[in-house]
Amino acid sequence: MFKLAERIKTLKPSATLAVDAKAKALKEQGIDVINLSAGEPDFDTPEYIKEACKKALDDGLTKYIATPGLLSLRKAICQRFETDYGFKYTPDEVLVTTGAKQAIFNFLLATINKGDEVLILSPYWVSYPVMIEIAEGVPKIVFSSMEKNFEPDLSEIEKNITPKTIGIILNSPSNPTGLIYSDEFLKGIAELVKKYNLWVLSDDIYDKLRFDFKPPKNILSVAPDLREKVFIVNGVSKTYAMTGWRIGWLVGSKEIIKVCSNIQGQSTSHATSFAQKGAEIALTSSQDEVKKMCKVFAERAKLLSQLLKEIPGIDFIPPQGTFYLFAKVSAYYNKKTPEGKEIKDSVSFSEYLLDSARVAVVPGIAFGNDEFVRISFANSEENLKKAVIKIKEALGKLK
């Protein structure tokens, strides 16, 4: 076999996608699996968005367009930022990408030189460290505890800053914890950013899924003077149940946006043209469907929290947003299954639930914390109730 590039030797498949794929494979075999591993809403894309896409196809929006995206969509993104956050951006400060994931990847490729360090707060979304490594950077993981709402001590973050540190990635509401960073914490991060001249990549993909139903916030909300240092990632996937449409965006200073656009122009070019029209309608139409979906997720979060409290040995903080709950399950480690297999970590715990209870969850090690598993409540209340019963029964068999 020919020699592979050194930079991809540590590349691993996405753990979340792997678990979801295994659960779906079991279902295809006729096995009843309750999938609580999914990273996407269980709702369908609203009809008015689909109709806009169909119309775009009928109108002939099927040719190449400019790499940064439709001007009308970029204007809609700017307007949405001003409405939701009070931030003013111009279309040349927006790059439309093939999902928010590409926005992150473009930015990291544009800003990281070999050996540069980027701070990541644990627990983190699975792809951050891998993307940094592909860009030949070094992910510096800063650990946090559930007891402190997964907000690391600012002193601990500062200890991890070296002359090689160039930036920090923030994600709030968080995947996997479902928690929202406090204003006080964000202000502290802002001071470190100023002190050490860092950039901030703010992954706001879940910003509308807040269970306090307040307007979205990010670090610019508490430190607007950081505008030139903050780059915002968002998209339509989670908020509008459009994961398969693959439309995201990066917003920030036009100099960096132009570089990211050049990178994209040499890889995928523009995101799908007619899908962009659907995204535009999603942003410019009534947001009532978003509010309805968020309300349902809030109700499910409350239900799941109540149900899990009945299982001894499982600890968690009730989610404040997203559609995830991060549950500490390490109390069950070192126990054995009825077949004599030891539960050693979050992977073996998750495998046991899938094999014994037919419930799929994601091992916490994928997010940087092996004591936890991520449970998605992007599923019906009926299935959530069934799943918790099955989990409780399976855990009761451990010795």
What is each of the regions a protein language model found here?
Residues 19, 36, 52, 58-64, ...:
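Glycine-rich loop-to-alpha-helix module at the N-terminal edge of alpha/beta enzyme cores
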Residues 64-97:
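Conserved N-terminal alpha-helix of the aminotransferase class I/II PLP-enzyme fold
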Residues 2-4, 12-14, 19-22, 26-32, ...:
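PLP-dependent class I/II
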Residues 8:
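Substrate/cofactor-recognition hotspot
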